From Swiss-Prot:
Signal peptide: none
Protein name as catalogued: Probable alpha,alpha-trehalose-phosphate synthase [UDP-forming] 2
InterPro entries linked to this entry: Glyco_trans_20 (IPR001830), HAD-like_sf (IPR036412), HAD_sf (IPR023214), Trehalose_OtsA (IPR012766), Trehalose_PPase (IPR003337)
Organism phylogeny: Eukaryota, Viridiplantae, Streptophyta, Embryophyta, Tracheophyta
Molecular function as annotated in GO: alpha,alpha-trehalose-phosphate synthase (UDP-forming) activity
Region (Glycosyltransferase): 12-479
Length: 822
């Protein structure tokens, strides 16, 4: 067993956070409460880890308490049971009944959003969504009040999807796990949720995400890919520079509790009474909540068909259905109850008699002893869930069948279908003919086959208990954290903006190298193609200020063609490199080619035809052609379809136009690029650097380099080029670089050779504004604020404007070195 002792040699604390505490609280008098622990799968699941962890529960106590004195009294009583209450006064109804049960629950169970008046639905949704976020914040506040360094937090279910994000924002060192106890739907269903992206991002903040089945995990990964555009791997999801592990943990029950209960004298007596009541008949059992997803109407329709087609069994079988009431206050549930009662009346009327009824329907819950007794005497367990998380009723039935070895007929849409599929008869509950046939097969099954099937299921239920589930999850969470930290160490840190500004202000010869697409280009909407790239209008004055500073040289290095760069930078005092350096241009001079004399471009027309073919057959894809390269881009196409098309496209290319060509083929995140061999941004910048030193007749070495862009992996040699040039003293190559004055920053990429990362191009824009102000303060002819900073709207980049204004006010702090007092 894994040793979980923390650095202090003590058991680490585990905070188990769920919507509801596992305690029933009843007021027994003024400021006094009676508490009773509620048994269940989650409680059982944590029994095995209480010896490893000091476990405390956090959740709603199940009662509304408004008086502070009563709150304190209940809190003190709950503390004795290691429970910490979250009082959700004022938000519970909108949070729980509204958003959780009215929005998330139907979506997760493939039922879709409520179909009501659109105007009312929008208003209601916003109110419920706000209450949901507020409730998650209230959980956070309670956790913060009780958090101790080193605590592990395990969040449960869809009620708390924002909590992992809130916890990491509070302290990103907290170990956070999140487990979903319901299904996760296909991406086509999930994407109808208005808050779809926000919820996905929030739970991806956790270190470990757990699901009941591989299907649920697969749907989640596919949804992350389609909605967030991230890659799902066998490890999980890499998002915003961190790894979130996604794994499968099928929950179980406490089988020993059921086995022990079946042997109690009072339960044995109940079993005898039930067998006497149903003497001479086979008993088919159903135990479900009266809920739309449980498929009770489908169960009755299949049973009706069975009785129609098998007259022999009409007086020899009885279906006992325990339908536990749930939400009688909801119209849909009242309608379901009426429908179920109608079916019971119809079937009993058709096939019943004065002395015998084929269906015994109970609209109530039963005590645990009676439940075990009826599980034990049943011949067949019939589970027809239309969509379910795990459905532990099937596990409970198996645990109680040690003597009788009855048959389990199980819906393929219940999570247990993937665990108990070997021993159960798996059915599609929507196919009443298939379910009817399965009932007949179960009733007629030979004893030897029943024994074999039961043995398989019984072994699984006993070895995959709730206790094992809890241990497995915590073992994975504790094992994945060091791995996550190791991954984080491989992932560069955020760019230290203040260090960049400080080094820039102290330097005398600065070099700034920037990409165009995804860096300086105007942010694109879904209808824009890369052929239409335009310089971000906020940067026009900024680049002008930087380029006119005699101490600063700016280079734009792009895969785009000469015409695009001319159109955007033609009038700037800037160095340009088109098609990854195949062509370069000094400020207002002429383009110079670096293309080898013997380069063969006969492949271009053939590749262009293949790209055109796939563009026509991949909606929202496009391709860009330049003199030495072509790029097919499917960034705005359906992600999975685009990837499949890209695989086919590559096969077409290798089989045809590039089979014998000297080209490089680069597979990007959402693109395929074919270009003349041998040219990369790293090779280009070495040549451009030599030209800069020569043409500017530099006498002072370059003592500051900032290099940033949204580059393909093969072009990241531009970062390693400068790493190799970092020297302890001035060198003849025109560089005087040290670790402290070289800054490379990849934009929005978790895996990179750059030293640092920037979340988005907005961060680069913001930094360039600030560097332009520093450059402006050291020049005689200063630009106006509006020339340097040209926001597209009045509210854009308020932080940048405040910083710029503060520097304007502090010009007196700038000395001869140009250093700004920070």
């Amino acid at each position: 067993m894994m040793d979980y002792d923390d650095a202090r040699g003590e058991r680490p604390r585990l905070l188990v956070v769920a919507n509801r505490l596992p305690v029933s609280a009843k007021r027994t008098g003024e400021n006094s409460w009676s508490l009773e622990m509620s048994p269940g799968g989650l409680v059982s699941g944590l029994l095995g880890i209480t010896s490893q962890f000091d476990t405390k529960w956090v959740g709603w106590p199940g009662v509304d308490v408004h008086d502070e004195i009563e709150k304190n009294a209940l809190t003190e009583s709950l503390a004795e049971m290691k429970c910490i209450p979250v009082f959700l006064n004022g938000v519970f109804d909108q949070y729980y009944n509204g958003y959780c049960n009215g929005i998330l629950w139907p979506i997760l169970h493939h039922m879709g959003l409520p179909q009501e008046d659109q105007h009312d639905t929008n208003q209601t949704f916003e109110t419920q969504y706000d209450a949901y976020k507020k409730a998650n914040r209230m959980f956070l506040d309670v956790i913060i009040d009780n958090y101790e360094e080193g605590d592990i937090v395990w969040c449960h279910d869809y009620h708390l999807m924002f909590l992992p994000q809130y916890l990491k924002e509070y302290n990103n060192k907290i170990k956070v796990g999140w487990f979903l106890h319901s299904p996760f739907p296909s991406s086509e269903v999930y994407k109808t949720l208005p808050s779809r992206s926000e919820l996905l991002r929030a739970i991806l903040a956790a270190d470990l995400l757990g699901f009941h089945t591989y299907d649920f995990a697969r749907h989640f990964l596919s949804t992350c890919t389609r909605i967030l555009g991230v890659e799902g791997t066998h490890e999980g999801v890499v998002y915003q520079g961190r790894v979130t592990r996604v794994a499968v943990f099928p929950i179980g029950i406490d089988p020993d509790r059921f086995i022990r209960t079946c042997k109690l004298p009072e339960v044995t007596q109940q079993m005898n009474e039930l067998q006497e009541k149903f003497a001479g008949k086979k008993v088919i059992l159903g135990v479900d909540r009266l809920d739309m997803i449980k498929g009770i109407p489908q169960k009755y329709l299949a049973f009706e068909k069975f009785l129609e087609e098998n007259p022999y069994w009409r007086d020899k079988v009885v279906l006992v259905q325990i339908a536990v009431p749930t939400r009688n206050d909801v119209p849909e549930y009242r309608k379901l109850k009426s429908q179920v009662h109608g079916l019971v009346g119809r079937i009993n009327g058709r096939f019943g008699s004065v002395s015998s009824l084929p269906i015994h329907h109970l609209d109530c819950s039963v005590d645990f002893n009676y439940l075990c007794a009826i599980y034990a005497i049943a011949d067949v367990m019939l589970v027809t869930s239309l969509r379910d998380g795990m459905n532990l009723v099937s596990y409970e039935f198996v645990a109680c069948q040690e003597a009788k070895k009855g048959v389990l007929v199980l819906s393929e849409f219940a999570g247990a279908g993937q665990s108990l599929g070997v021993g159960a008869l798996i059915v599609n509950p929507w196919d009443v003919t298939e379910v009817s046939s399965a009932i007949k097969e179960a009733l007629n099954m030979p004893a030897e086959e029943r024994e074999t099937r039961h043995r398989s299921n019984f072994q699984y239920v006993c070895t995959h208990s709730a206790e094992k589930w809890g241990l497995d999850f915590m073992s994975e969470l504790n094992g994945i954290i060091p791995e996550s930290e190791m991954q984080m160490r491989k992932i560069p840190l955020q760019l230290p903006e203040q260090d960049v500004i400080q080094q820039y202000s102290q330097s005398n010869n600065r070099l700034i190298i920037l990409g165009f697409f995804g860096t300086l280009a105007e942010p694109m909407n879904s209808g824009t193609k890369e052929m239409d790239l335009k310089l971000n209008p906020e940067l026009k004055g900024t680049l002008k200020a930087l380029c006119n500073d005699p101490k600063t040289t700016v280079v734009v290095l792009s895969r785009s063609g000469k015409n695009i760069l001319n159109k955007n930078f033609g009038e700037s005092n800037i160095w340009l490199a088109a098609e990854n350096g195949m062509f370069e241009k000094q400020t207002t001079g002429e383009w110079v080619t670096n293309m080898p004399q013997n380069v063969n471009l006969d492949w271009v027309d053939g590749v262009k035809n293949v790209f055109k073919y796939f563009t026509d057959r991949t909606p929202r894809s496009y391709f860009e052609a330049s003199e030495t390269s072509l790029v097919w881009n499917y960034e705005y196409a359906d992600v999975e379809f685009g990837r499949a098309q890209a695989r086919d496209l590559l096969q077409y290319l290798w089989a045809g136009p590039i089979s014998n060509a000297s080209v490089d083929v680069v597979r990007g995140n959402h693109s395929v690029e074919v270009h003349a061999i041998g040219e990369t941004k790293g090779a280009a910048i070495g040549r451009i650097l030599g030209e800069i030193v020569h043409r500017k007749s530099m006498t002072t070495p370059i003592d500051f380099v900032f290099c940033s862009g949204y580059f393909l992996e093969k072009d990241e040699d531009i970062y390693t080029f400068f790493e190799s040039k970092i020297l302890s003293s001035k060198s003849p190559n025109g560089l005087d670089l040290k670790k402290e004055n070289y800054f490379s920053a990849a934009i929005g990429q978790a895996r990179t050779k750059a030293r640092y990362v920037i979340d988005s191009a907005h961060g680069v824009v913001d930094l360039l504004h600030k560097l332009a102000v520093v450059a402006d303060t050291t020049m005689t002819d200063s630009f106006s604020d509006s020339e340097i900073y040209e926001p597209r709207d009045a509210n854009a980049n308020e932080n940048s404007k405040r910083w710029i204004n503060s520097v304007r006010r502090r010009k007196v702090e700038i000395g001869d070195t140009g250093q700004i007092g920070m």
